[in-house]
Each structure stands twice: as structure tokens, then as C-alpha cells.
Amino acid sequence: MLGRMGTTFEIPTLHTDRLTLRAFRAGDLDAFAAMQANPEVRRFLGGTPLSRAESWSLMERILGQWAMRGYGMFAVEIEGRCAGWAGVLHALEWPEPELAYSLDQPFWGRGIATEAAGAARAWGFTRLGCARLASFIMPDNVRSARVAEKLGAVREDQTTIRGFPVDWWVHRT
């Protein structure tokens, strides 16, 4: 039998007018897996829809980043359900921390991504104490670029992340 892990970590809960940004929990799996199985949602997140098991593993990785780095992605809750994610992540191959966000398709076009990403952005600047965050956005992802612009980000460069060309948007404090 393996020993118990002694690491503990806290994930704060953030509130906006319409949203709660909080830790992912097991009860989010049905909504999260449906979102990750949607080809339109996954189009700009690697392109391949995820199975239920892959969605569970993604939730585990999201929680693992909180344990390893002390920050990560929040579940975005609206109308009593998990509608997506927003937060700050920093994968090993990323050149700097990224403000990232993604919502399930029924929640598109309602300003929810901007609201969630704005709350995560403010929290990220405070938590990390940094002067900038990146958003790596595929060139065809017009909706995500619009969110970045609304939050005051500026497209500064292009790079390749996990084999995909992306525009490098920069958010400054």
C-alpha cells in the first residue's frame, strides 16, 4: 500500500456578479466531460474531443497544478453548474504564465468568458506578483482574441505551443 500524501493546498473561491470561480470537484465531471467532448469547444484546445476518462484526467492535472505551483485553473460556475474554466497556468514548455479560459458552448456570447477571465487575471496578478501574463491564442480563435482585447491585452508576437501556431497576447498590470 502506498503512503498518504502529506501535501495540502488551498484553492480560493472568487465571486463576480454572475459567477463563482472555485476548485474543480468530482461532481463537475458530467458537465465538464460533455464540454470536453464537444468538437467546437475543443477546436482551439488541441482539436481532439476528449473522452469522459480523459476529461477526468484533465481535472486531475488541473488540481495537480494547484498542488505543484500554488495557482491554476478555476472551475467557472454559473447557474449552478460547471460551465468551463479560467485561471493561470504555467506548463513546463510555456515561456511564461498564461491567463487561459474556456467555456462550454451554451455560455458563449454572453460576456461570461470576459467576466471569468477578468476575475482570474486580477487574482493572478496579485497571487503571482508579476507585471504580465500571456494568453496564447490560435489565430482563428476570434472569440478568445476579443476577450483578450476587452481585458486590455495586446498581441505582441507569435510562437508555437504544443505544435500549434499561436498569437502571443500580453496582459499587463
Q: Where in the sequence are the language-model features?
A:
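Acyl-donor (CoA/ACP) binding surface of acyl/acetyltransferases
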Residues: 1-44, 60, 73-173
